[in-house]
Amino acid sequence: MMQICDTYNQKHSLFNAMNRFIGAVNNMDQTVMVPSLLRDVPLSEPDLDNEVSVEVGGSGSCLEERTTPAPSPGSANGSFFAPSRDMYSHYVLLKSIRNDIEWGVLHQPSSPPAGSEEGTWKPKDILVGLSHLESTDAGEEDLEQQFHYHLRGLHTVLSKLTRKANILTNRYKQEIGFSNWGH
């Protein structure tokens, strides 16, 4: 029984989640030959109503998958992949995240285009969301709790991003009329 749990944990390790995401984005990048065709094409799929996320047990136990309802419009959970974004925006964002994972995050202040202040991510936003994990007394920090919280978050985000990359790849194939490529 221990062997099954170990294999299951390895299958759902952070490294494997990152590799699945990077592989999905590489596949998307190789499939999308003309990215400009993605402009003004909405990325909508009927099966996106339920997102799949991965839970890490608080005691380090095996992971379990669960389905959660999709975030409501305007909620913080759906901000990166807002319905108003087109396939090209998703394509650029997914490639950017892949590059950040592979090469590290460059700390360059980026100047947003004029009039695009709404809906942009700011570094302080993550600090607001994590403020409940910070303790007033440094000795009271629960590093294990923080680790599991962030690990759960990484697994959830990587699962959703991988799914988005796969959906974008399939939608591109449909848009150009090659829905049976690679099958």
UniProtKB/Swiss-Prot annotation:
Keyword Acetylation: yes
Region (Disordered): 51-77
GO BP of this protein: lipid metabolic process; negative regulation of microtubule depolymerization; positive regulation of fatty acid biosynthetic process; positive regulation of ligase activity; protein polymerization; regulation of lipid biosynthetic process
Molecular function (Gene Ontology), one example: identical protein binding
Modified residues (Phosphoserine): 72, 75, 79
Keywords: Acetylation, Cytoplasm, Cytoskeleton, Lipid biosynthesis, Lipid metabolism, Microtubule, Nucleus, Phosphoprotein
Subcellular location per the Swiss-Prot or TrEMBL entry: Nucleus; Cytoplasm; Cytoplasm, Cytoskeleton
Domain of life: Eukaryota
N-acetylmethionine PTM sites in chain numbering: 1
A matching Pfam family: Spot_14
GO CC aspect terms: cytoplasm; cytosol; microtubule; microtubule cytoskeleton; nucleus
Function: Plays a role in the regulation of lipogenesis in liver. Up-regulates ACACA enzyme activity. Required for efficient lipid biosynthesis, including triacylglycerol, diacylglycerol and phospholipid. Involved in stabilization of microtubules.
Self-association and partners: Homodimer in the absence of THRSP. Heterodimer with THRSP. The homodimer interacts with ACACA and ACACB. Promotes polymerization of Acetyl-CoA carboxylase to form complexes that contain MID1IP1 and ACACA and/or ACACB. Interaction with THRSP interferes with ACACA binding.
PANTHER family in UniProt: MID1-INTERACTING PROTEIN 1 (PTHR14315:SF16), SPOT14 FAMILY MEMBER (PTHR14315)
Family classification: Belongs to the SPOT14 family.
Protein name from the UniProt record: Mid1-interacting protein 1
Organism: Rattus norvegicus
